[in-house]
Amino acid sequence: MESPRDILKRHGLRAKYSWGQNFLGDEDALEAIADALNLRADEPVVELGPGLGHLTRFLAATGARVTAVERDRDMVMVLEKEAIPGVRVVSGNAATVDFAQVAGAPDVAVAGNLPYHLTSPILFRVLEQRAHVSRAVFTLQKEVVERLAAEPGNRDYGLLTVLLGMHYDAENVLTLEAWRFHPPPKVDSAVLRLTRRKSPRAPIIDEARFTRVVKASFAHRRKTLINSIKSDPTLGTTETLIAALEAAGVDPQRRAETLTPEEFAAIERALGPLTPATSTPAE
């Protein structure tokens, strides 16, 4: 396979540092990433930020129907000239893509070597569209993958860990050293696999309020749970929140990183039915 450096040179291009472009050209790593998605022949898969098409080729080799969504016009030009069989190239923003619409299918797999600065927007997008995303494999900054795959009680455990964990099983499947990329990033990367659960880990009354509960809980990580969660006045008074924590069986003096997704769900349920005053949308 032609290296990223050689493809860029052939097309008279350079990696755009401001776009976070670091191209993975290591064939063993690319094959492992494609294998981690467990694609079936003719299955729809959306690749976000395909760049020069290295992973795209391995995804297409599985027989899957690949839709490659790329924002950089130079990369779109390269992909169209390369004309990889079984691949449809779409110009678009990975952070706002409608997965089902772009793939023309109600349920899709998703893959991508994501620019680090777009990690959170894209993961939140997957959460928003989880009804259409059965599983995903993303190459991310190593410390981000470790955070997303962390267990309660780990200092890496945080907001997105809980929100993703309600609906997906997260696994750190592969570490990728910086030298495997062109140009090499300043830190190592890792591959995150998300597999949608058949049902959420625990029932909740309102998704937006659940998100607010988790956000408020992690807003001040060094504070106790009650002192952090009360920072969101839309959730209720301090007395209401203490009562909800106790009803959920959660000690108000604990810290957010020690709670399981199920415990956060119990807190949300303990806040009771929504009223017009408590139904403010999550930000």
UniProtKB/Swiss-Prot annotation:
It is found in: Cytoplasm. Transmembrane segments: none annotated. It catalyses: adenosine(1518)/adenosine(1519) in 16S rRNA + 4 S-adenosyl-L-methionine = N(6)-dimethyladenosine(1518)/N(6)-dimethyladenosine(1519) in 16S rRNA + 4 S-adenosyl-L-homocysteine + 4 H(+). Keywords: Cytoplasm, Methyltransferase, RNA-binding, rRNA processing, S-adenosyl-L-methionine, Transferase. Its EC number is 2.1.1.182. The keyword Transferase applies. It is an enzyme of class 2 (transferase). GO terms for cellular component: cytosol. S-adenosyl-L-methionine binds at N22, L24, G49, E70, N113. Disulfide bonds: none annotated. It holds the Pfam family RrnaAD. SMART domains: rADc. One of its GO terms (molecular function) is RNA binding. Specifically dimethylates two adjacent adenosines (A1518 and A1519) in the loop of a conserved hairpin near the 3'-end of 16S rRNA in the 30S particle. May play a critical role in biogenesis of 30S subunits. HAMAP family: 16SrRNA_methyltr_A (MF_00607). Belongs to the class I-like SAM-binding methyltransferase superfamily. rRNA adenine N(6)-methyltransferase family. RsmA subfamily. This is Ribosomal RNA small subunit methyltransferase A. It comes from Myxococcus xanthus (strain DK1622).
